[in-house]
Amino acid sequence: VYISLADNMLYKSGSYEINERAGETLSKIAKIITDYKDYEVLVEGNTDNVPISRTNIRNNWDLSALRASSVVQELQNKYGVDPKRLSAAGRGEYNPITDNDSELGKQRNRRTQIIVTPRLDQFLELIDKAPEAEGEAATE
């Protein structure tokens, strides 16, 4: 499961603090995460390439990591998601999905991604159960 959220859905402008309207979205996401209780959850923060001007945040690396951490803590503290399943990561401005040459491009790059994945042992089980691709013959 892959969820990408625009920064203005979750945070106050130029901040890593969760805004009031994020609750409904995070509540729904927490439900999905809870339904996949044996899966791991990675929250990644991403920014545009505009340098941050807040004195308490050094750069876009920090901002992206702080935003991801805020979401992880909200999922844990407010919605009861097991913290052992959660990871937070900041990608800064280095994982753009489009160029930063326009306001629209910058807006699209300012996002938080939530990725729900099976643990490695579960993934290997899924591979073992997967049918062979067409054209691949089983070797005996």
Q: What annotation goes with each model-predicted range?
A:
Residues 1-10:
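Extended, gly/pro-poor, charged amphipathic helical "stalk/hinge" elements that serve as dimerization
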Residues 1-2, 21-33:
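Extracytoplasmic beta-rich ectodomain segments of secreted or membrane-anchored proteins
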Residues 12-24, 36, 46-140:
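Periplasmic OmpA-like peptidoglycan-binding domain that tethers envelope proteins to the cell wall
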